[in-house]
């Protein structure tokens, strides 16, 4: 009987050790900036304008909605919860706007949490999406040629285009 109790004791200790190892590996895999994402509320919805230079392509990743407006001046506005807006990354490089959601633990949060990027652009040549998110054109976009690529993505797409050639 005493041997059985010792086995239970050591079994419980192993379960505790494995649990602590699992928790510590979960916490250490988070980037320093996003260490507490899993327990942080999204906060009040806020909008933030970001610097924009001319671009003709958009590449976007997970859990971000895109709204496109016709504009002669390029613009980028991000709307999200105040605690999470810094995790929505917008980078411009060589005429391409890259949009990423670096917030972690999105599976913990409500599906009502939305991250939206509104862009103003004169002529858009292509959109590539690599995750979840809806794409909406608020105005008709004109271009000679337009390409839309969807790589393992889901969401709705409502494009208003006036172009000679399109690749969807």
Name what the model sees in each region.
Residues 9, 13-17, 30-83, 102-120, ...:
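Short acidic/polar N-terminal linker immediately downstream of export determinants
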Residues 96-102:
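Short carbohydrate-recognition loop motifs
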Residues 17-23:
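Sec-dependent N-terminal signal peptides
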Residues 48, 56-68, 116-168:
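Extended, compositionally simple hydrophobic/Ser/Thr-rich segments
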